[in-house]
C-alpha cells in the first residue's frame, strides 16, 4: 500500500519561485478546500520558464511514483518537465519527525546545489505524466502494491536512481517547468506524490501515517487499490468532513471529466455561461472578454482580440455563439450536482425569500423617516419660539444646513399628514432639487436671505412688543442698518454686523457711536439696550 503524501492530513509544505495568478496559488495543490484544489496552480501570464515548485514533507519519504496533471482547458502549454529530490541530514530529519507527531513543522528549502535530477520528460500533445520508481518495494505494515495499468494518453517515465538517498530518503521534491509551447501559461492542475515513510523514520511516525491513511480512504475500498490516471479523486477527509461537504472531490472530478473542452473558457478554465466568438476563431466567455477590454483600457489601448492582439473593427467584432450557448445550457441542466459551483449556475439560497430581506430594510427606513420628521418638527418649533433667526457665531454653511433640515422636516410632515399623490411627491422632489441647485447662486441667496430676515424681524418684534408692532407697522425691504440704512448681504458686506435684543441690525461704526451715548437705545424702536445683549451675526 502506498499513500498520497500531498494530502493535507500529512501537513506538506509547498513553495514556488514565481508569482502565481489570483485564485490559482500554488497552495491549491495541497489545500483542504476542494474548490481551491480543483482550480490548481497557474502563474501570471507574463511569467516565463523555468518555474520551480518545491514540495517539502515533514518526514523523509520513499517515492513510489509522481503523478502530474497539466490540463489547461484542452490546450497543451507545458512541454518540458524536470524532477529533483533532496534529502536532509539525519539530525534535521529526526527533529522534523519528532515535531510532526506533535504539531506542524516549518521545513527549510535547501539550496539549488542540494537537489539531484531524477527525472526529465519532453511532452508532445500530452497533459498527464507519471514518474515511477522501478525499484520501489513496499515494507510491512504496508502491503505490496499491485501493477498499475496506465492509459495510452499518459506519459510514463522512470525515475533515475542517483544514489541511496535520491529516491528512498526524500525530504524535498522539486518540479521544474522548463519549456512551454509558444506564449502558453505554466500551470499544474493536480499533483500527487505516492510513497511510504523512509526506513529511517521512527515507528511512531509510521504508525501515524498508517492511521491517517486508513481513516482517509473509504472503508469499502481496499487500501492498496490504485486508480487511473489521478489517484486521489476520493474525499481525503474523514466521514465527518464528507457529511458537512455538499460536493465531494470525486463528484467534482466526474463532472470535470464529462465537461467537453469546447464548453470551457480557454483563459479562465471555467464553463462559459455566455460564449462569444472572436474574429480569431476562439471562443471565450463574455465576462472574460470584458475583463480583457478593461485591462487594455487601463493601458490606453482599444479593445482587441486577447489571442491575436488585433483591435476590433466594425467588420471584425466578437459575436454571440447561440448554438454553443444552447448546448452548454443543456449540459448544465442534465449534469447538476448539489453544491458544485459551476460558472453561470443560479444560486438558489439567496433568491428563496426576497421579502424576508427587503421588509426589515423598509421598516427601518420608515422608522428613520418618522424619527427625522419628529426631530425636525421639534427643532423647528423650539427654534421659532425661543431663538431669533440668526444665532451667535453661526456661519453661512451651518445656516444653509439647518434650512435644508427644516425643509426636509416640513416635507416629511406634509407626507405623513395624509395620502399624497404621485404628482405632489414629484413636485416636492423637483422643488427640493431646484432649491439645492440654485442655493449656490448669489442672486438667489441674497433674495432668500432678505425674505427670511424680514419674516424673522417681524416675528421677533411681535414676540417682544406686540402692542408697538401693531401701532408702528414697518415694511423692511432687506437687511440693513437701523441707524445709517446700509444694506447687508452675504456677498457685499465686509464689516461685522451686530443684532440688538429687539431684532434690529447695526453696523460696526453705528454701534460704536451708540456705545458712546448713554443710555444706549435702538434707533428704530427706541428700546434700551445693554452692551452684553448685543450679538454678532453672520449671513
Swiss-Prot record:
Pathway: Protein modification; protein ubiquitination. One of its GO terms (cellular component) is nucleus. Gene3D superfamilies: Zinc/RING finger domain, C3HC4 (zinc finger). GO terms for molecular function: ubiquitin protein ligase activity; ubiquitin protein ligase binding; ubiquitin-ubiquitin ligase activity; zinc ion binding. Pfam families: DUF5918 (PF19318), U-box (PF04564), zf-RING_5 (PF14634). The keyword Transferase applies. GO terms for biological process: protein polyubiquitination. Keywords: Metal-binding, Nucleus, Transferase, Ubl conjugation pathway, Zinc, Zinc-finger. Expressed in testis and placenta. The U-box domain mediates interaction with E2 ubiquitin ligases and is required for the ubiquitin-protein ligase activity. This is RING finger protein 37. It comes from Mus musculus.
